[in-house]
Design a protein with these regions (language model features):
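Glycine-rich phosphate/diphosphate-binding loop of Rossmann-like nucleotide-binding domains
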Residues: 1-53, 62
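Glycine-rich beta-alpha junction loops
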Residues: 20-25, 51-55, 67-71, 140-143
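Glycine-rich phosphate/nucleotide-binding loop
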Residues: 60-64, 68-179
């Protein structure tokens, strides 16, 4: 399902990986191993193998498969790490010492670049997949701009008929497994 949605955005088959505690096939629980085995047996998905937690942000995969609990923990841990990193740098920059002055000079340009890299209001909302319609779940701290962008994503998914494309892809994968 994530592969079909990502392909709509990327314009190419996405790289799909399963989140695991290691890259070796012997690692992981039964659910993770079965999932990887199923994905590796279909030509309809560009499966690239396992991905570890420390690789999530390193452009190893376009779609990362995991259960909802693990995915939510990863998302919130990433958010928390980024927030802590920014707070620490801001504290250093705001210090009225020579160290603070140097930090301001070094990091001000970097901060401006980072602000434009992934603005949270532009990428607000997660598509709930596997439904017959479109549902976009927004972040609890979303502002008006973020909600507008989430609505734009919903309109895009309606125009591209994403639920039926996902259904078609899923049907192809299931048929492939039975023949």
């Amino acid at each position: 399902m994530g592969s079909a949605l990502a392909e709509e955005h990327l314009g190419r088959p996405p790289r799909v990986a399963v989140l695991n505690i290691g890259a070796e096939e012997i690692k992981g629980n039964d659910l993770v191993k079965r999932c990887a085995e199923m994905l590796s047996q279909t030509d309809a998905i560009n499966f690239v193998g396992y991905i570890e937690g420390n690789q999530i942000l390193h452009d190893v995969a376009d779609v990362i498969v995991c259960d909802g609990f693990v995915g939510n923990v990863c998302l919130k841990a990433s958010e928390g790490t980024a927030q802590l990193f920014i707070e620490k740098i801001k504290t250093s920059i705001m210090a009225s010492t020579i160290k603070g002055w140097i930090a301001r000079k070094l990091f001000s340009r970097l901060f401006n670049e980072l602000k434009t890299l992934n603005p949270p209001d532009q990428y607000n909302g997660a598509s709930l997949l596997g439904l017959r319609g479109i549902v976009i779940k927004s972040h609890g701290s979303a502002d008006v701009s973020a909600i507008v962008n989430a609505l734009g994503e919903a309109v895009h998914e309606v125009k591209r008929q994403v639920p039926s494309r996902i259904s078609d892809r899923l049907e192809a994968v299931l048929l492939e497994r039975h023949y």
